[in-house]
Design a protein with these regions (language model features):
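Short beta-strand His + acidic residue motifs that chelate non-heme Fe in jelly-roll/DSBH
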Residues: 20, 41-43, 65-67, 73-78, ...
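His/acidic/aromatic-lined binding-pocket segments of jelly-roll/cupin-type domains
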Residues: 9-10, 29-34, 65, 75
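Double-stranded beta-helix
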Residues: 49-50, 55, 72-123
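A short glycine-rich, His/Asp/Glu-containing loop-to-beta-strand
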Residues: 1-22
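Glycine- and acidic-residue-biased ligand/ion/polar-headgroup-sensing regions
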Residues: 27-46
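Short, surface-exposed coil-to-beta transition loops
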Residues: 27, 70-71
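Extended, positively charged loop/linker patches that create polyanion-binding surfaces
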Residues: 41, 45-66
Length: 123
């Protein structure tokens, strides 16, 4: 938990919802490297407007994204069996409420999360 760099393999399936969040206070960069499968990495401004949408798929030569500190972001998994390698500066800091986007549904609201992810795909 106190390591200077945190690394995690994460296996994800379509329908997995990662609420939009940021890493602020402490400010941390985050890197996603897609090892298998594909996903959309989506960045937002403070009002929830999409500022960037990046399709990551190693079969197409698009492997990863580095997300700057304090930038709102989420992912939408596109392919079954997707595996990502996440790298973030340590030490571990759990997400606090101010770092979860108030303009997006919470993880506990499955239907709203499904609708949100569908909307992200249609943009």
């Amino acid at each position: 938990m106190d390591a200077p760099i945190h690394r995690m393999l994460n296996a994800l399936e379509p329908g997995t919802y990662l609420p939009p969040h940021r890493h602020k206070n402490p400010d941390k960069e985050e890197v996603y490297l897609v090892l298998r499968g594909s996903l959309l990495a989506i960045l937002f401004d403070d009002e929830g407007n999409v500022t960037e949408k990046v399709h990551l798929n190693p079969a197409e030569g698009h492997y990863g994204i580095e997300i700057p500190p304090c930038v709102w972001h989420t992912i939408v998994v596109l392919e079954s069996g997707t595996v990502i390698y996440e790298i973030k500066q340590g030490p571990f800091a759990p997400l606090i409420p101010e770092n979860l986007a108030s303009w997006a549904p919470p993880a506990t609201d499955e239907e709203a999360a499904r609708v949100f992810m569908q909307r992200m795909l249609e943009l």
